[in-house]
UniProtKB/Swiss-Prot annotation:
InterPro entries: aa-tRNA-synth_I_CS, aa-tRNA-synth_Ic, Rossmann-like_a/b/a_fold, S4_RNA-bd, S4_RNA-bd_sf, SYY-like_C, Tyr-tRNA-ligase, Tyr-tRNA-ligase_bac-type. ATP binds at K232. Its EC number is 6.1.1.1. One of its GO terms (cellular component) is cytosol. It comes from Lactococcus lactis subsp. lactis (strain IL1403). This is Tyrosine--tRNA ligase.
């Protein structure tokens, strides 16, 4: 199976230009290709990861990747299918975010070895000294207004209004393709399905200005079985930066993927072969309650993004938090991350309460009678250890890093005491 057929088998091809010619090129030649990343945040996220891994698949097949950071286009903002104008970022912010994108991409792409080693460039390099007059004469003249407003990404904004700044974005992205072709013989662009209009502006400019054929592959919007955009947890993006989304949070995200989506996501987000995935699917369907596909997803993706050690720590954290282990084996940060949704109670320095009084003060038990019953019945745990003494008082040894204590009532209800 050639790389193009594999991408299709994994559900990673939505639209292409001239599929036969593209498949032939990917089979016979080393193709130079690129993906653009506008620095619109200080970290890439799970949606970006689909494209990053697709870049890696092509590199592993012998093709040469170029990661284009949108130092110039990031100052403008892509209007594609957005309801309103993006906020413009300062040049300093865009420069700072561009640097972070590179460091994240280096985890996945090989920038060091071989003829097809990855390279990174920034479109600010060619836009910085391009005058407005030159841009209109050398680039703008190749695009008719009719062509530009026919793009679905622009049509969706015609009623609400679109500034000339954002309207011109597709020409800027098209010019990126032209420049990369002239500088590095790049002939293929990858992007999300919402980028089709901007990307084909590039193939059009390449045809008109250089009489060359360029290719485009768009990757489908990744959705779950209900049709919702995949890659968010409770409305929040899953970031690749561990300071924004911890390895533990990413691990839990993958563990909680719906059964209907798990095998699909294995094809998209892992480098397991399709044969291996078929075997996992067979075992998974035979015993869905064991959640094998989700466990493999969590292992593969967290290890890929954050490393094996971070994955193993996430497993350990999960087992201790939800398996009844000794929480003192974990650091305070891991506990607070894992129990983010648990109620918290600030204990003041002058509180020296018995466990019964503390359960009431923290809202864990509604009354002294209920608190005593919970303790004597063995339903109260401090940092994972059962406590049945009614006169028990929290001591420094119960304070993890002198910052917190976890009280569990029953099997699952956790409360965090902070100091």
């Amino acid at each position: 199976m050639n790389i193009f057929d594999e991408l299709k088998a994994r559900g990673l091809v939505f639209q292409t230009t001239d599929e036969a010619a593209l498949s032939k090129a990917l089979t016979e030649d080393m193709v130079s290709y690129y993906v653009g990343y506008d620095p619109t945040a200080d970290s890439l996220h799970l949606g970006n990861l689909v494209l990053i891994l697709t870049m890696k698949r092509l590199q592993m097949a012998g093709h040469k990747p170029y990661a284009l950071v949108g130092g110039a286009t990031g100052l403008i903002g892509d209007p594609s299918f957005k309801d309103s104008e993006r906020s413009l970022q300062t040049k300093d912010t865009v420069t700072k975010w561009s640097g972070k994108i590179r460091s994240q991409l280096e985890r996945f792409l090989d920038f060091e070895n071989g003829e097809n080693k990855a390279e990174m460039t920034n479109n600010y390099n060619w836009f910085e000294n391009l005058t407005f007059i030159d841009f209109l004469r050398d680039v703008g003249k190749h695009f008719t207004v009719n062509y530009m407003i026919s793009k679905d990404s622009v049509k969706s904004r015609m009623e609400s209004g679109i500034s000339y700044t954002e309207f011109a974005y597709q020409i800027m992205q098209g010019y990126d393709f032209y420049e990369l072709n002239q500088l590095h013989n790049v002939t293929l662009q990858l992007g999300g399905s919402d980028q089709w209009g901007n990307m084909t502006a590039g193939t059009e400019l390449l045809r008109r200005k250089a009489n060359k054929q360029g290719h485009v592959i768009t990757i489908p919007l990744i959705t779950d079985s209900t049709g919702k955009k995949f890659g968010k947890s409770e409305g929040n993006a899953i970031w690749l930066d561990a300071d924004k989304t911890s390895p533990y949070e990413m691990y839990q995200f993958w563990l909680n993927v719906d059964d209907a989506d798990a095998v699909k996501m294995l094809k998209i987000f892992t480098f397991l072969s399709l044969e291996e995935i078929a075997e996992i699917e067979e075992q998974f369907e035979a015993a869905r309650h064991e959640r094998l596909a989700q466990k493999v997803l969590a292992r593969e993706v967290v290890s890929l993004v954050h490393g094996k050690a971070a994955y193993e720590q996430a497993v350990k954290t999960s087992e201790i938090l939800f398996g009844g282990g000794d929480l003192r084996q974990l650091d305070a940060k891991s506990i607070l991350t894992g129990l983010k949704a648990a109620p918290q109670h600030q204990v003041t320095d002058d509180e020296d309460l018995t466990l019964v009084e503390l359960l009431i003060s923290a809202g864990i038990a509604p009354s002294k009678r209920q608190a005593r019953e919970d303790i004597t019945n063995g339903a109260i745990y401090i940092n994972g250890e059962r406590v049945q003494a009614l006169d028990y008082v929290i001591t420094d040894s119960d304070k993890i890093e002198n910052r917190l204590t976890v009280i569990r009532r029953g099997k699952k209800k956790n409360f965090v005491l902070t100091y």
